[in-house]
């Protein structure tokens, strides 16, 4: 966090953030929905200080007041976008719920190692005031407000709008988007005010994905394949970039961290591609495919070809490396994006997945690997599922990983993870030449939680990180 007395939260620049203190604790939501355990989801606090006697242990659990919320992603009440405002303090974690559409505001300032509920925004406020539901990404704005993307409407249809919360009272103020401007689908978003732009992505209709994944629903148009470009000051959708068959289900989107940059990268889950989006000379925005993970021909799986399923992506704070997870194939990749038009693969590590040697799936044709990877065992625990959410340390040298995607899809694709619980792992990163190596001394086994096996999802540090903070 900022050290000067006249500064606001976060850091002045992304490169300043890279010099920030090493992370000591992590927050992550743990989900019981669809596990057969009728208990509330909770926010776990994990000790990640190697000098601590409680290293790689859950040191606190904050249960939510309700069941079946499906905690998912989180954001901050304020971040580096408010760096110039000394009145702003980063002390509340915003937890929108994917299924219930509640919003929990969690106080992490009073005692960072023991968070507490500060406020609950009930679903009816989101439904009535905004006509939105199924909340996903939360970002703080430079003006002090909090903006949360929606995936649907209250009836289960796709609807990509944005809820605005007051940054002090956390009351629902209404929609960010102008009336009638919501996109057909929603998911993630990132803004870049110096170019007067925001770009949002598309998952699918909640009434489709909430019941499990079906390929025929993709073919029926119930999942997205476009980037939606917004005028940042007028709150209007000014362009739709259709990514086509190569861009099915675009999920996490990241502009480069440099606030002057007019380009970024987005991962498309089902097509297993990464697109570079960029501003053209005429002011319009365009996209080009820069990475393609080939599908594998398989036997013993739901389909004859298995996609990698790119689910989470990150860009290091110096805009040098891209990281992403292939949830089904089971690997995390590191690319040098010094030239974002030509990413170069410099690191790769397998951490589970659906093509393990000795498992039910036989790979018949593989353009990447000579043989199926072996199961991964850490501290005696066989890693279930596949790598999913990732978070990079500020200095870029450590990557934290969890392996739950969404409870219903976890149950469909990795039923063993429902029984065993998910895990949290840590990868050491070579930031000079590239390279990823598993830390054998770090494991959080969420199969051994007091309330029973649980599914752990997105990761956050108290001082912000490369996916929560936006520089303006």
Swiss-Prot record:
GO CC annotation: cytosol; membrane; nucleus
Location relative to the cell: Nucleus; Cytoplasm, Cytosol; Membrane
Reaction(s) catalysed by this chain's protein: methanethiol + O2 + H2O = hydrogen sulfide + formaldehyde + H2O2 + H(+)
Presence of the UniProt keyword Membrane in the record: yes
Pathways per UniProt: Organosulfur degradation
UniProt record, GO biological process: protein transport
Domain of life: Eukaryota
Entry membrane topology: Peripheral membrane protein
Keyword list, A-Z: Cytoplasm, Membrane, Nucleus, Oxidoreductase, Protein transport, Selenium, Transport
Similarity comment: family membership: Belongs to the selenium-binding protein family.
Free-text function comment from the UniProt entry: Catalyzes the oxidation of methanethiol, an organosulfur compound known to be produced in substantial amounts by gut bacteria. Selenium-binding protein which may be involved in the sensing of reactive xenobiotics in the cytoplasm. May be involved in intra-Golgi protein transport.
Protein's name in the database: Methanethiol oxidase
Protein source organism: Xenopus tropicalis (Western clawed frog)
């Amino acid at each position: 966090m900022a050290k000067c007395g006249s500064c606001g939260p976060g850091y002045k620049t992304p490169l300043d953030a890279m010099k920030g203190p090493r992370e000591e604790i992590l927050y992550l939501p743990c989900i019981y929905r669809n596990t057969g355990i009728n208990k509330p989801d909770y926010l776990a606090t994990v000790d990640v200080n190697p000098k601590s006697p409680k290293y790689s242990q859950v040191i606190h659990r904050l249960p939510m007041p309700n069941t079946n919320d499906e905690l998912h992603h989180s954001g901050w009440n304020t971040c580096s976008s408010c760096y110039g405002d000394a009145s702003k303090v980063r002390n509340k974690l915003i937890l929108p719920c994917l299924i219930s559409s509640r919003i929990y505001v969690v106080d992490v300032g009073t005692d960072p190692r023991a968070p507490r509920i500060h406020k609950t925004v009930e679903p009816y406020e989101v439904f009535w005031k905004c006509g939105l539901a199924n909340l996903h990404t939360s970002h703080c704005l430079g003006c002090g407000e909090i903006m949360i993307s929606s995936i649907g409407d209250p009836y289960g249809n796709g609807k990509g709008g944005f809820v605005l919360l007051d940054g002090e009272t956390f009351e629902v103020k209404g929609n960010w988007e102008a009336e009638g401007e919501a996109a057909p689908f929603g998911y993630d978003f990132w803004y870049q005010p110096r170019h007067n732009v925001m770009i949002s992505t598309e998952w699918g209709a909640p009434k489709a994905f909430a019941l499990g994944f079906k390929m025929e629903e993709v073919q029926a148009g119930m999942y997205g394949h476009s980037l939606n470009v917004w005028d940042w000051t007028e709150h209007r959708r000014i362009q739709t970039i259709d990514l086509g068959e190569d861009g099915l289900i675009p999920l996490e989107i990241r502009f480069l961290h440099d606030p002057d940059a007019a380009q970024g990268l987005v991962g498309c889950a089902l097509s297993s591609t990464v697109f570079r989006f960029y501003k053209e000379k005429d002011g319009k925005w365009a996209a080009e495919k820069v990475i393609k993970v080939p599908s594998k021909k398989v036997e013993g799986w739901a389909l004859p070809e298995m996609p990698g399923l790119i689910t989470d992506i990150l860009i290091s704070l110096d805009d040098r490396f891209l990281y992403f997870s292939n949830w089904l194939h089971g690997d995390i990749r590191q690319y040098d994006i010094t030239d974002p038009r030509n990413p170069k693969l410099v690191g790769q590590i397998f951490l589970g997945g659906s093509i393990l040697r000795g498992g039910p799936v036989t790979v018949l044709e593989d353009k990447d690997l000579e043989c199926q990877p072996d199961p991964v065992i850490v501290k005696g625990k066989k890693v279930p599922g596949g790598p999913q959410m990732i978070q990079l340390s500020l200095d870029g040298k450590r990557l934290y990983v969890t392996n739950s995607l969404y409870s219903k899809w976890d149950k469909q694709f990795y039923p063993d993870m429902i029984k065993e619980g998910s895990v949290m792992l840590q990868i050491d990163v070579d930031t000079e030449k590239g390279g990823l190596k598993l830390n054998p001394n770090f494991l959080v086994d969420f199969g051994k939680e007091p309330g029973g096996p649980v599914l752990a999802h997105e990761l956050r540090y108290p001082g912000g990180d490369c996916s929560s903070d936006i520089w303006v």
